[in-house]
A protein has these predicted regions:
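A generic structural motif
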Residues: 121, 211, 329-336, 366
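Acidic/histidine-rich catalytic neighborhood of metal-dependent amide-processing enzymes
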Residues: 114, 121-196
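Active-site metal-coordination/substrate-binding segment of hydrolases
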Residues: 77-149, 442
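Flexible glycine/proline-rich, aromatic-decorated loop/lid segments
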Residues: 193-208, 417-422
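A short core secondary-structure module
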Residues: 165, 220-241
Length: 455
């Protein structure tokens, strides 16, 4: 079958593909906020209808949370399952957006044209690259490129509470030869296949001291201040060399193989440029590790939020009853998230004084994943990406967490390949999220080339 005709069709119909993406981006499918539940269902229905128009047998499947979209189509060749997620992050702080987050537009920037909207890169723009490649292939050849399953989640940004039960319940339906995940990015301007993902452990802690807020003049110096207790706990989590002090935290962590270390060094990662783009200059983390190691292959502990007492306008001399913090850990192969949760909580308990209490609330746990690149499909996809982007594709790590990659292995007994077209400056999870028009266009073309290589 002619690949050139498909690529030409993609080029010719890019404006229509952008229109469809914009229609999806206008739906505020924020999964963490119950106020947007109907919008999440609307996004799922929109995608199911679009897939049906391409010849998929597709539907939005109900779950206790937000719907899953599942579509089956095509025949012959290697059975590929594509995964993406249609839910998006909240838009706070809204006042930092240059325009309404769900009013997508194309902007001209010094670095090229970009699509500006919440979800543009994470993950609506990415998932639509796959769907648009299917559309162009069908337009040219009258059929989908092979046997395909599309599996789109609506709770990825809120911990995926329905994902494992759904996958276990529909194990046989979802089973394929290989999973394709489009939720990662390029390395600089170079195409990449992600082969290592860190796991994630989320914890919220609340320290309670007095049974109500107190006047700091009447009680200050005599009553325990939970903010001070919490600050001490947070300060205790790292030593002066940047290592995490939770007992047993590094159990099972191994050093990076020399071959992988050499490959990463060959990428010529410029940490000064990487940090400079966000107004920083000095690498943090363990002092004896390179920035790429810290980003991709070392575990971390970060404070994501801390609050308590009075934070409104003006000043209030309050001694608060409670203090709160949200803390996340990025994990690497060999670490057990459930054991680490226990170790962290035990560490915190040892630091809570007699007159205070601590409560914990968990926010998900997933182990790290390492992909098996011995499958010939990886080299075939790598070559296809290189042809499209005009430069070799690299195998890279990813500091983020995509639990579905591990679930494909543990639940469905199949490998996953992670290919994406995002960039470091896409501002995912932040105001003014964007997705390069080039990433969208060449992403569609990349999938068409991968179809030709794998199906």
């Amino acid at each position: 079958m002619s690949l050139d005709a498909v690529l030409s069709r993609i080029d010719e119909t890019l404006p229509e593909a952008m229109d469809r993406l914009f229609a999806l981006l206008r739906i505020p499918s924020i999964s963490t906020d119950p106020a947007y539940r109907a919008d999440c269902a609307r996004a799922a229905d929109w995608l199911a209808e679009d897939l049906r128009g391409l010849g998929f047998d597709a539907a939005a499947r109900a779950t206790p949370g937000h719907p899953m979209v599942v579509g089956h189509g095509g025949e012959g060749g290697r059975h590929l399952l594509f995964y993406g997620h249609y839910d998006v992050q909240p838009v706070d702080p809204l006042d930092l957006w240059h325009r309404a987050p769900f009013d997508p537009t194309v902007e001209d920037t010094p670095h090229g044209r970009v699509i500006r909207a919440r979800g543009a890169a994470d993950d609506k723009g990415q998932l639509m690259t796959f769907i648009e490649a299917c559309r162009a292939w069908r337009d040219v050849h009258g059929a989908l490129p092979g046997r395909l399953t599309v599996f789109l989640e609506g709770e990825e940004e809120s911990g995926s509470p329905s994902l494992i039960p759904f996958m276990e319940r529909h194990r046989e339906e979802l089973k394929a030869d290989l999973a394709l995940i489009c939720d990662t990015g390029l390395f600089e301007d170079q195409p990449a296949i992600t082969t290592m993902l860190r796991g994630l452990l989320g914890e919220e802690i609340t320290i309670t001291g007095p049974n109500k807020d107190l006047h700091s003049g009447s009680y200050g110096g005599a009553a325990m201040n939970p903010i001070r207790v919490l600050a001490g706990i947070i300060a205790s989590l790292h030593d002066e060399d940047g290592r995490i002090t939770v007992p047993g935290f590094y159990d099972g962590v191994t050093d990076l193989p020399e071959a992988v270390r050499a490959q990463w060094q060959a990428l010529a990662f410029d940490h000064r440029k990487f940090l400079g783009e966000v107004g920083l200059s000095v690498p943090a983390g363990e002092h004896d590790r390179t920035p790429l190691e810290m980003l991709w292959s070392r575990p971390t502990c970060e404070v994501n939020g801390i609050w308590g007492g009075y934070t409104g306008a003006g000043f209030k001399t309050v001694l608060p009853s409670q203090a709160h913090a949200k803390i996340s850990f990025r994990l690497v192969p060999g670490q057990d998230p459930h054991r680490l949760r226990d170790n962290f909580r035990n560490h915190v308990r040892t630091m809570v004084p007699f007159d205070c209490q601590v409560a914990f609330h968990e926010h998900g746990a997933s182990a790290a994943s390492v992909m098996d690149i011995s499958d010939p499909a990886f080299e075939a996809a790598r070559a296809a990406l290189g042809q499209e982007w005009g430069r070799p594709a690299s195998y890279v790590g990813c500091g983020g967490s995509i639990p579905i990659a591990g679930y494909f292995r543990s639940i469905l007994d199949m490998d996953a390949m992670l290919i994406g077209f995002g960039r470091d400056d896409d501002q995912i999870h932040s105001p003014n999220e964007k997705y390069d028009v080039e990433s969208f266009h060449k992403g569609i073309r990349s999938w068409a080339r991968i179809f030709a290589a794998l199906t």
